[in-house]
Amino acid sequence: MRDFDKRLEKAIERGQRAGNLRAEAEAQKALSERELRRRHTDYRLKLSEHIEGCLRQIPDHLPGFRFDSIVSERGWGAAASRDDVELRRGQKPVTLFSRLEMLIRPLAESYVLELSAKATVRNRERFRRTHYQRLADVDLESFTGLIDLWVLEFAELYAAKS
């Protein structure tokens, strides 16, 4: 019986250790979730400011564009857009829409930082892009570089079509 008592006590101790380890892991996971949320907020603020700074310059260089900040359930960012009317002899006027929208998406369960962009030039979608990285591995320079690149590409596409 003594042997069984010892084995029973060891089994109980192993169970308690496993329970303690599981509780510690859950506490660590909650802490890391909090940290990931904090990081997402920090990155979102920095990148949405960069997006606004870049898109705010489009109306200065391409007259007729309007700048709009975006804060919605779809994300945080900005858009630059304009409407043109094309008049052709003997035809109805055609409204032409151009817009560049860039957003940092809300935090998802996958814990990634996601940048999305959609560009339309004269009623034709020119690109729709998404770039994301895990929050633990974010390289802000790659995001700001893509924002700059996509804004420049949109300006070039618009200038070529107008």
State what each model feature region is.
Residues 22-23, 27-31, 78-91:
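Conserved N-terminal glycine/acidic-rich loop preference
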Residues 14, 18-66:
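Contiguous, amphipathic alpha-helical segments that mediate oligomerization or scaffolding
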Residues 142-146, 151-162:
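Terminal low-complexity "docking" segments
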Residues 1-23, 162:
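Terminal, compositionally biased segments
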Residues 61-81:
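Long, charged, glycine-rich C-terminal linkers/tails
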Residues 47-49, 65, 74-76, 94-98, ...:
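Residues at beta-strand starts and edge strands
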Residues 1-10, 81-142:
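Intrinsically disordered, low-complexity regulatory segments enriched in Ser/Thr/Pro
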